[in-house]
Amino acid sequence: MEKSLNEVREAARKKIIYTQHALDAMNVEEEIVSYEEIRNVIFKGEIIEDYPEDKRGHSCLMFNYTLKQRPVHIVCSPKQEFLAVITMYVPTIDKWKDDFRTRR
């Protein structure tokens, strides 16, 4: 997944675009997530699932803790000219193990 991580970060250095779904998810009242927090996941986080056959093109699920120490997951897809952030969410214990990297 190291190659995929490099592709994600290289695409993000060019430009990051957000789908409407991602923007809506970032602005859920209980879990408002900033652009800076998303950038933190992209540039300091890790890929925990890889989806090479995704219908939108190769995509992956990334994870990191924000500076506020809350876990954040993003699904993104690296393109030639940009990184598309498809969605994001704050993972919960009912769906993820304590490490927030492993599904229940």
Residue ranges and their predicted role:
Residues 1-104:
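Ribonuclease/tRNase effector modules and their secretory precursors
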